[in-house]
From Swiss-Prot:
The active site is at 117 (proton donor/acceptor), 179 (schiff-base intermediate with acetaldehyde), 208 (proton donor/acceptor). Its EC number is 4.1.2.4. Belongs to the DeoC/FbaB aldolase family. DeoC type 1 subfamily. The gene is deoC. Pathway: Carbohydrate degradation; 2-deoxy-D-ribose 1-phosphate degradation; D-glyceraldehyde 3-phosphate and acetaldehyde from 2-deoxy-alpha-D-ribose 1-phosphate: step 2/2. Keywords: Cytoplasm, Lyase, Schiff base. It is an enzyme of class 4 (lyase). CDD domains: DeoC. GO terms for cellular component: cytoplasm. Its main location: cytoplasm. This is Deoxyribose-phosphate aldolase. InterPro entries: Aldolase_TIM, DeoC, DeoC/FbaB/LacD_aldolase, DeoC_typeI. It is found in: Cytoplasm. It comes from Thermotoga maritima (strain ATCC 43589 / DSM 3109 / JCM 10099 / NBRC 100826 / MSB8).
Length: 248
């Protein structure tokens, strides 16, 4: 069934796909509400995370994205706000055992995470081990029912058909978003990848653009081509760029 759905999606892509914006524009509030203010650096300190959370509160970002060891701290810093705590699972390689990813996700939610960004098993995807990839994602989704799960497909390592397959499997497995990149690979988000991903998953799922998004113009372009969320460590700079352009 999985293979059939992938083949069907590839055939539709070859016949009907057209690269064009999905919306005409995006304003500063659209950008703010899409940003997941991110610090996944291996040398991030508790003070860095406190600053990240303060900036997210002040700018009314959607959320912060932090490494698992900082979920509790971020939860405390954001208490009483609408800012979501997002963390990562199987990060950054995606090569953990499936049960390890599931347990990581459970521990993260117990610590206060609202959303989980898990890394797909890239090697298994490239080997066309579709059932493995499906179960890998499904196990995380099932382990944290009621929480948002995003699947990082690491587009820089995939060809077009593999990107389509990753999106199809993520959707079948019950994930809520697909995400372009870890930020630790050889490339980040592109408008072309974001648009393709949105075209495949449709309105039933979201798309998170992440990796290399550093300016207001970058963020607007991603949203115009289908991104629902923006993962970036440059959230404040992006907002400042929008305010300089439009006033604020």
């Amino acid at each position: 069934m999985i293979e059939y759905r992938i083949e069907e999606a590839v055939a539709k892509y070859r016949e009907f796909y057209e690269f064009k914006p999905v919306r005409e524009s995006a304003g500063i509030e659209d950008v703010k509400s899409a940003i997941e203010h991110t610090n996944l650096k291996p040398f991030a300190t508790p003070d860095d995370i406190k600053k990240l959370c303060l900036e997210a509160r002040e700018n009314r970002f959607h959320g912060v994205c932090v490494n698992p060891c900082y979920v509790k701290l971020a939860r405390e810093e954001l208490e009483g706000t609408d800012v979501k705590v997002v963390t990562v699972v199987g990060f950054p390689l995606g090569a953990n055992e499936t049960r390890t990813k599931a347990h990581e996700a459970i521990f993260a939610v117990e610590s206060g995470a609202d959303e989980i960004d898990m890394v797909i098993n890239v090697g298994m995807l490239k080997a066309k081990e579709w059932e493995y990839v499906y179960e890998d994602i499904r196990s995380v989704v099932e382990s944290v029912k009621g929480k948002v799960v995003k699947v990082i497909i690491e587009t820089c390592y995939l060809d077009t058909e593999e990107k389509i397959a990753a999106c199809v499997i993520s959707k079948l497995a019950g994930a809520h978003f697909v995400k372009t990149s870890t930020g630790f690979g050889t490339g980040g988000a592109t408008a072309e990848d974001v648009h393709l991903m949105k075209w495949i998953v449709g309105d039933e799922m979201g798309v998170k653009a992440s990796g290399g998004i550093r300016t207001f113009e970058d963020a607007v372009k991603m949203i115009m081509y289908g991104a629902d969320r923006i993962g970036t460590s440059s959230g404040v700079k992006i907002v400042q760029g929008g305010e300089e352009r439009y006033g604020g």
